[in-house]
């Protein structure tokens, strides 16, 4: 049975600091790219060094296991100040695992030992990750004091009206986790309707955006949704809402 390591440093947002400076390390990341700030932040927080060829791989898909690795690093950074300290405690136990599992297991077991990830994805670590699976990996990564629900009311209203995030229903895998990312400012969707595209594969660029919004409050977003018409009658009296017509008696 795996033992849970004792971690010396106190956990907290004060551990989420940028320890590096991004100076163009990724050859495929122009400064005007949508995810430039996110990918640069991922490097500066010590969460990624990119791919072997010197690129970040913005449009490349990610496996479920790779999302788990990034999540494990963030959790460890929050808990210890070191993105690898937590998973490292499980590295010896992972030596007996085969192939990619040997790489993924320390991060997976670490997250599970922390109680922030279940076993739902254990059998698909080598498969391409969907955006819904990414949401499941991230949803409980930090406590609410570190990841507050800054958009709770707006997202609740937009979703309940079925005018926003319409491609996510109660039958969508991990739909509660997806909605939590909206409530926390980690996602605002991919179009004006706030669509999440839960079954689409997550790219490394889109993943970088979500990951760094988890870590850095300054990168979190609020949807630009105008829902005022939903409450245009708030405070109105009944007689203001109902047009009184002419009385016509029923025929005898």
Give short role names for the model-derived ranges.
Residues 41-42, 111, 181:
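PEST-like intrinsically disordered low-complexity regions enriched in serine, proline, threonine
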Residues 2-34, 49-65, 72-105, 112-132, ...:
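Feature responds to low-complexity, polar/acidic, surface-exposed segments characteristic
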């Amino acid at each position: 049975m795996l033992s849970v390591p004792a971690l010396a440093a106190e956990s907290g947002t004060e551990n989420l600091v940028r320890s590096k400076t991004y100076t163009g390390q990724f050859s495929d990341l122009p400064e005007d790219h949508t995810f430039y700030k996110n990918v640069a932040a991922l490097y500066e927080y010590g969460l990624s060094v990119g791919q072997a060829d010197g690129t970040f791989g913005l449009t490349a898909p990610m496996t479920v296991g790779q999302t788990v690795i990034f999540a494990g690093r963030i959790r460890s950074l929050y808990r210890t100040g070191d993105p690898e300290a937590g998973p490292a405690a499980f590295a010896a136990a992972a030596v007996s695992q085969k192939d990619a599992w040997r790489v993924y297991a320390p991060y997976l077991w670490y997250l599970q030992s922390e109680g922030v990830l279940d076993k739902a994805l254990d059998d698909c670590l080598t498969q391409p990750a969907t955006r819904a699976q990414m949401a499941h990996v991230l949803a409980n990564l930090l406590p609410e004091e570190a990841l507050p629900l800054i958009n709770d009311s707006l997202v609740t209203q937009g979703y309940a009206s079925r005018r926003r995030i319409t491609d996510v229903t109660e039958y969508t895998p991990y739909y509660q986790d997806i909605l939590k990312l909206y409530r926390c400012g980690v996602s605002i969707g991919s179009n004006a309707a706030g669509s999440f595209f839960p079954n689409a594969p997550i790219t490394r660029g889109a993943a970088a955006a979500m990951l760094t919004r988890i870590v850095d409050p300054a990168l979190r977003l609020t949807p630009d949704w105008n829902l005022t018409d939903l409450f245009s009658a708030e405070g109105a009296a009944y007689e203001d809402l109902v047009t009184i017509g002419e009385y016509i008696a029923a025929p005898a």
